[in-house]
């Protein structure tokens, strides 16, 4: 299920810079989720178009996904809708 893939938005200073300048959002996701699953979950939950997904495992043992949105979607607007700020 797509609602189980995304745990919560990852909010750091770097995440804010990515959002402002590169139209990217960062999320902590389920450890077993693949890039395609993350893209599908973001597209269905937030009604945006995803161009690319990069994932990495953090030092805390969590999986972080950096999601790049299409130029038609604004990462700041999506972040405000989901309550990042």
Language-model-detected regions and their locations in the chain:
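Contiguous, often N-terminal, cationic amphipathic patches that form binding interfaces
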Residues: 1-85
